[in-house]
Swiss-Prot record:
Tissue: Expressed by the venom duct.
Any one GO cellular component localisation term in the record: extracellular region
UniProt keywords, alphabetically: Disulfide bond, Knottin, Neurotoxin, Secreted, Signal, Toxin
Compartment annotation: Secreted
GO molecular function: toxin activity
Signal peptide: 1-19
Domain statement: The cysteine framework is VI/VII (C-C-CC-C-C). The presence of a 'disulfide through disulfide knot' structurally defines this protein as a knottin.
Disulfide-bond pairs as recorded: C24-C39, C32-C49, C38-C53
Provenance organism: Californiconus californicus (California cone)
Name this polypeptide is given: Conotoxin Cal6.17
Function as written in the Swiss-Prot or TrEMBL entry: Probable neurotoxin.
Main location: secreted
Amino acid sequence: MSGTGVLLLTLLLLVTMATSDDACSLLNGDDCGPGELCCTPSGDHQGTCETSCW
C-alpha cells in the first residue's frame, strides 16, 4: 500500500513540474532558484516560486 502511495505522489510531482516551470512543493523542500521563495496557499504544500510572498 505504501509503495502505491509513493508512486502516485511521484507521478503527481512529475506532472506538476512538467505543467508549470515555476511550481514548487514544500514536500521536496525549496525547489526554487536563488532569491526565490516557495509561496503556497494556506493549507497547501504545492505553490509557485516568487521573489516575495504576500
